[in-house]
Amino acid sequence: MPRAPTSAIKKQPLTFAQLAAYDDILTDALIDHVYYWTAIPKNRPLYHPSRGIREEEITKIIQTHLIVDPDLAIAEEKLLATDGLRKFHNSLRTDKEKEDFKAHLRRYISIYLPDCPFEVNATNRFTIDSYEASITARRPIRRNEAIKYLAGTQVTVTPEEEAQLALRKKDFSLVVSSRSKLTSLFMGPARFANHDCAANARLVTRGSAGIEIFACRDIGLGEEITVTYSESYFGENNCDCLCQTCEDNVANGWKPKDGTVPVHRSIEESVLGDDQGYSLRRRRRERSVSVAGSRTSSVTPDIRPRIFKTAKNRAMASDRASTTDSDGIDVVAMAVAAPKRNFDTTALSSPPLTPAKRQKPNHYDVVPLPLGLDVSRDSSASGPVDSLIATEDEKSTATQATTPEFEEPKPPSMREKPLLSPEMSPMKEGATPVGALNGERDEPTETGAPLSVLPTTETDLPEETLDIAATTPSLFPSSECSMTANDLPEHITPVSEPPRLTQEGKSVARQDSQETIIEESLAVPNSAPSQIQEAENNAQQGAETPVLGASSLTAEPHNEVAPVISAVSTKKKKRRVSEKPAPEPVRKQRVPGDYTLTPLLLAQPETAWIHCTNCNTAFVQSDAYYTRANCSRCERHSKLYGYVWPKTAPAGKNDREERVLDHRLINRFLHPDDEAIIRGRKPWRERLGQSSSSLAPSEERGRQRESGTPQGTPGDNYRRSGRARRASAKAMAQ
C-alpha cells in the first residue's frame, strides 16, 4: 500500500526582510496617511513612499467601512484595490507571501474599529527634537485584560542582523525572550508600545510567531500603555532609560551627574507664595479659558503659555512653575536651552563692503613670503613702476560700473606701495620657496609641481605685454611677471649668486642646450628685517595662508629679459595627522520634563506651545498666528470619528450628539474673543465699549419717519414716507 501523505506541512516562517517590507508599506499607508502629524520610523534604511497612496482615498475607506459601518472584509478589499497597495500585493510571488501580507494588513486596519481601546499617539520623551509613536488608552482597561487589537507578529533576528539594526539605529522593536534568551523583532500595532521599567502591560507570545499584550494593572483613560523590553535594553541595568518611571524617580537616564536631586515646590507654596504679588511688568490675566476655570495661573496653565528663551527670564519665571500636568516644565526648559549668542560689535564699526567701495586691483592684503632673501618692499615700488601702476589704477577705477564718482588721485607719497607679484598661491608648512632655489630641477619639488620657465629672449615676450602683465595682474590668469634690469632702481643692483651644492656635492643649477636659468637675489636695506621676521613667524604656524607667488627679479649679464620661475602646486601635500583616539561623544544631561514647554522647539517664528482645550496636553503649533483649539491627537480623532476625543460611536439610540464626519465643517481655531483673552488683550466688543448682548441696532438708511406720522398706502393722499402727496404745478396747468 502506498504511504499516506502527511496531514499538514509545517508553514515556513516569515523572514526579517519580508516582515520589514510588509510593515514599512502598511505603516506608511495606514498610519502616516491617515491624518497623522508625524511619520513612523521605517525598518529599511531607504524607503520611498508609494505615489499611489493618497490620504483622501485611504481615510475615506477607513471612515466608511471601519468606523461608520465596520466590515473588515470590505475594507480589506477596498484598500487592496488602491494603486499603492495593489502594486505591492501583485509584486509578491507566492500565495504564502500574499496571505501573510493580508494578515498583517488586517492587524493594522483593526485599530480603527470603534471598540478598539487604544489609539496611536506620538511622544518626544526619548528624543526632544523628533517624535516617536506611542499607545494611549482611550477607555479604562482592567487588570489582566487582553488589550484588544494590540497584537503583532515576531521574527527571530540573528546577531549579524541585530548589529546592522543597531548600526542604523533601527533597533526600536527588539525584545529578548525570558525563556529562550533569543532576540526577536516584533511588528504590527504592538510595536508602538514603548518601554517602561514599571510597565502597566506585558508581552505574551501566542503560537509560533504571534504576540499579544495584557494589562498588568488597571490602566486609566489617557494613560500610555507600556511594556518592558528587557532588563538591560538601555545599557547595563537600563542605566540610560528615559521612561516615565525613571523620570518620576529621577533615576537612570534622568539622574544628575553630581547626584543632587531637584526639590519640587509644593502647591501651597506656589499658590500662596510671593509669586502672586503685584508686578508692574506682568499683565494680570483675569480671564482664563482653561478647562478647570481657575483664575490662579500657577495652578492651571494658560492655553498659550509664555515660554522664555533667555536664561535671565527663565530664572525669574522658575518660581512660578506650574504644578499641573506640566509640573516644573518651565524650570526644565532652562537646563536645555543654549545661552544667548554674543554678537561681535567690531564688525559694525565700519560699513559693510559694497560694490561702490570695492577694493582696487592694486591693493592687496598679502602676507610676505619668507624667501630667505633680503627683499625690500619699499624698493620694489619705486621709480617708473610706481607711476605705471598709478596710471593703470586710475583707468581701472574709472571703468568700474558700480563706482558712483571718481576719486581724486593721491600724490605719490600718499599711495600705497604695490607689490610686483600679486599672484596668490597657497603656502603650506614644509614647502620650499622658489626664491631659495638657485637653479632648475627636472624632478618635481617637494610639493610635486615642476618649475615653469619663461623664454629668455626679448622677442618671445614683447615689452608691451610686460607692462600690462606687471600692472594689471588680475586681468590675466598667467602668474609670470617680469621686468628688465634697466627698470630697476638705482640703489638696487643685480647680484649673481653661485649655485648651491647638494649633499652629494653636485650643483643644483644645470646647463641646458636651449635655456640657461640663473636665479638672482636682491639686497635688502636694514629697514626690512622686522617684516621678514614677522613673515617667517606667520609661515611657521602650520595654517594654509594665501601668499604671493614665488617669483623673483632676475637679470643676466647682457641686460636681457630674465625669466621668472613660478612654482604652482598641482597636488596638495597631505598633512600628517597623528592618529589619536576619537573622544567619546558627551551625553547630554537630561532634566525631567525637558521635552515639553521647551524653547528648543520654538526655533521658527510664530511657533508656540499650546495647551489643548480638550485634554490639556501641551503641543507645539507652527505658524501660530491663530491658536488651535485642540492638539494633533484630538484633532485627528475628531476628523476620523466625528466626535470629540475619546468618543468613537454613539452611546445609544437616545444619543442626540451630532456626528460631523466632514472635518471641513469644523472650525479648528479658538474664538476671536478667546484668542484675545489668552494673549492678554480685551475682546474687541469690550474695546469698543459694547457688550455682545446689548448691541445698538443698526440705523436704517434714509430719512426717518416721525412718530405718529401715518404710513402711506396706495390710493390715499400720503406718500410711503408719510409726507402729504401734492399735485405738481405742471399737472394742474394742463
From Swiss-Prot:
Keywords: Chromatin regulator, Chromosome, Methyltransferase, Nucleus, S-adenosyl-L-methionine, Transferase. GO terms for cellular component: chromosome; nucleus. Its EC number is 2.1.1.372. It is found in: Nucleus; Chromosome. Residues 527-543 have a biased composition (Polar residues). Residues 343-459, 523-543, 567-591, 681-734 are annotated as: Disordered. The keyword Membrane does not apply. One of its GO terms (molecular function) is histone H4K20 trimethyltransferase activity. InterPro entries: Hist-Lys_N-MTase_N, Set9_fungi, SET_dom, SET_dom_sf, Suv4-20/Set9. Residues 407-418, 578-587 have a biased composition (Basic and acidic residues). The keyword Nucleus applies. It catalyses: L-lysyl(20)-[histone H4] + 3 S-adenosyl-L-methionine = N(6),N(6),N(6)-trimethyl-L-lysyl(20)-[histone H4] + 3 S-adenosyl-L-homocysteine + 3 H(+). Pfam families: SET (PF00856). Residues 116-230 form the SET domain. It comes from the Eukaryota. One of its GO terms (biological process) is methylation. Its main location: nucleus. Histone methyltransferase that trimethylates 'Lys-20' of histone H4 to form H4K20me3. Belongs to the class V-like SAM-binding methyltransferase superfamily. Histone-lysine methyltransferase family. Suvar4-20 subfamily. This is Histone-lysine N-methyltransferase SET9.
